[in-house]
């Protein structure tokens, strides 16, 4: 007899909750599941689970990628893991933990058990969200895409295209997933002791990225570029993005709502915890930017759900060992990972993870009769122009160097641009017209450093495009 990945997930979650709430050992909880006559009310939606199983069990949908493993004397194929959630209530409505037809019970579930490097998909969670919320930067803030420091004699960090692009808006930096601006924005959030403990604790405790390790607070690479000491799971990453999909409120996940005994008595009640983390305005600024990732970037376009506004973030790790996409529509949130179980490069020219995500999510929306949908813009935002060189209100000399974006009311530029003498440093001062910062908080300061708290660790850049 075989169980689906959904059944495996429910089984393991109920066992864990029986152990925690009833002080059972694992063997006692497992025995209760098999012999206790329990009735479990699942959050899984059979039509969604069916769509995912049908699509991801067909090798024709997963690309023709493979490599020959000499040690095993056989070909191996990239695996896939995907989670689909309702972000408003935390319900897991579909889950797949591997490619192909599933066999057996309680087999390895890559959606909940595989801990992988997230690459750039981590940036909205650990770097930009708090920076928007605390007005450290706006979408129109101008920041340098240039080396932050020398590392082993080389410029660090690098970008996927091997180039640096000079001054640009935060909106452009996040849309294109450029690495140096992300590092600079993280540095604005550094603690007095030189670590990023506050950022780490927020991600681990509030956004429930529980696989993060204490070592991830040290250095710049872990929390800015997703070069973590251990990694994260697909379920963790998908759940964390609920903070944006649910308009600023983080919603924990669940695969069941309650468990009853054979006599109808409630044994477990699974109420999800919700926490207001960001303002609706902050969440919308992120959604607006991540919509552009899907609309404009090479790897993001394939994730577009037909007729429905779609937002999301790609992630790719060094040597293309891991490919991620975490995205959402006004209705559903989903995350996907694609790669080999053992670190081996997948194709860099094709973003299978966004192709799969877009195809599966389009089928799910169509099955639900959803043919359109827009993200709701909250009050408290203004649409304002800015000079793309200074970030100030455009003046007469700014012709050809202007753009529009959303600002939280009160953070939009108010001073007219008076020249193009260089970039404006993002400042912890919520006044967006501030043009200087203290040296220890200046993210545009390039340096050669031997201070361990400033060292990238590890040094490999995220090759995200």
Annotate each language-model stretch with its function.
Residues 42-71, 82-86, 94-95, 101-114, ...:
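A penicillin-recognizing enzyme superfamily signal
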Residues 416-465:
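Ser/Thr/Gly/Pro-rich low-complexity, disordered linker/stalk segments of secreted
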Residues 136-199, 250, 262-292:
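Conserved catalytic neighborhood of penicillin-recognizing serine enzymes
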Residues 40, 78-79, 103-125, 138-143, ...:
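Short active-site loop at a secondary-structure junction
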Residues 52, 89-90, 116-143, 173, ...:
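Active-site SXXK
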Residues 1-43, 50, 205, 209-210, ...:
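Non-catalytic, structured segments within soluble enzyme domains
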Residues 35-43, 109-118, 157-163, 169, ...:
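Second-shell loop/turn segments in exported
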Residues 155-157, 190-238:
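Mid-domain, small-residue-enriched loop/turn segments at the edges of structured enzyme/sensor domains
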């Amino acid at each position: 007899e075989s169980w689906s990945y959904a059944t495996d997930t429910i089984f393991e979650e109920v066992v864990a909750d029986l152990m925690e709430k009833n002080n059972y050992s694992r063997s006692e909880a497992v025995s209760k599941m098999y012999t206790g006559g329990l009735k479990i009310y699942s959050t899984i939606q059979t039509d969604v689970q069916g769509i995912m199983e049908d699509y991801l069990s067909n090798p024709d949908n997963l690309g023709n990628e493979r490599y020959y493993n000499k040690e095993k004397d056989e070909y191996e194929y990239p695996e896939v893991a995907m989670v689909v959630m309702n972000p408003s209530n935390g319900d897991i409505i579909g889950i797949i933990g591997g490619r192909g037809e599933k066999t057996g019970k309680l087999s390895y579930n890559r959606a909940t058990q595989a801990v992988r490097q997230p690459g750039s998909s981590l940036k909205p969670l650990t770097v930009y969200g708090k920076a928007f919320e605390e007005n450290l930067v706006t979408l129109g803030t101008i920041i340098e895409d240039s080396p932050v420091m020398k590392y082993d004699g080389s410029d660090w960090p690098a970008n996927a295209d091997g180039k640096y692009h000079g001054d640009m808006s935060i909106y452009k930096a996040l849309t294109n997933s450029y690495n140096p601006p992300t590092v600079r924005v993280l540095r604005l959030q550094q603690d007095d002791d030189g670590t990023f403990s506050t950022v780490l604790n927020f991600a681990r405790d509030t956004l429930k990225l529980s696989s993060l390790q204490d070592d991830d607070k040290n250095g710049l690479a872990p929390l800015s570029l997703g070069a973590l000491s251990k990694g994260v799971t697909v379920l963790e990453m998908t759940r964390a993005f609920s903070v944006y999909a649910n308009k600023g409120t983080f919603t924990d996940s669940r695969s069941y709502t309650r468990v009853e005994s054979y006599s109808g008595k409630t044994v477990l009640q699974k109420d999800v915890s919700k926490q207001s983390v960001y303002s609706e305005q902050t969440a919308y600024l992120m959604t607006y930017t991540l919509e552009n990732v899907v609309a404009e970037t090479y790897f993001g376009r394939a994730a577009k759900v037909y007729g429905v506004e779609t937002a999301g973030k790609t992630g790719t790790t060094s040597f293309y060992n891991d490919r991620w996409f975490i995205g959402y529509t006004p209705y559903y949130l989903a995350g996907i990972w694609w790669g080999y179980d053992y670190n081996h490069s997948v194709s860099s020219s094709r973003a299978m993870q966004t192709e799969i995500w877009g195809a599966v999510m389009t089928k799910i929306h169509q099955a639900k009769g959803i043919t359109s949908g827009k993200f709701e813009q909250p009050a408290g935002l203004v649409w304002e122009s800015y000079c793309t060189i200074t970030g100030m209100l455009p003046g007469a000399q700014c012709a050809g160097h202007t753009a529009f974006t959303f600002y939280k009311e009160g953070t939009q530029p108010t001073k007219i641009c008076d020249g193009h003498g260089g970039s404006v440093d993002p400042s912890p001062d919520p006044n967006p017209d501030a043009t200087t910062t203290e040296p220890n908080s200046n993210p545009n300061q390039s340096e050669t450093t031997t201070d361990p708290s400033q060292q990238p660790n590890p040094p490999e850049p995220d090759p995200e495009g």
